Amino acid sequence: MILVTGGTGFIGSKLMQMCKNTIACPSLQNMAEDDIIRIMEKHEVHTIIHTVAISDIGVCQANPEASYLANVQVPVYLAKAAKHAKLICFSSDQVYSGMEEDGPYTEDTVKPNNIYAEHKLEMEQRVLDIVADAVMLRAKWM
């Protein structure tokens, strides 16, 4: 089974339509790591596709704690719960937002210039520390 976070959002809903054997993860807003583990065990999840984020830069700047929870801590919970599951996380091309020259850029050449981008970069690093083969998709805003 594939667990899709943000199953009612723009990207998540498209994934739910395209992929077989998917379930939408309930809201992660008040979930703890144990709640995610229970969902994964109940549905025998083998893949997690994480699409949820607070992506409005202005909202992130005004509410850094909420941004950190949504954009860093929740993905870390998913990584810890994903012991035997493949984890795919949507990140952002904003990690390159401080670059002076136009891309393309290498994966290691990052320069975030706003709190959203900083949180996305921290998410990538922390998740990969937990799940080394996790996939990070640095998508443009959609």
Report residues per predicted region.
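NAD(P)H-binding glycine-rich loop region in Rossmannoid oxidoreductase-like domains
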Residues: 32-70, 81
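Rossmann-fold NAD(P)-dependent oxidoreductase module
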Residues: 14, 18, 81, 126
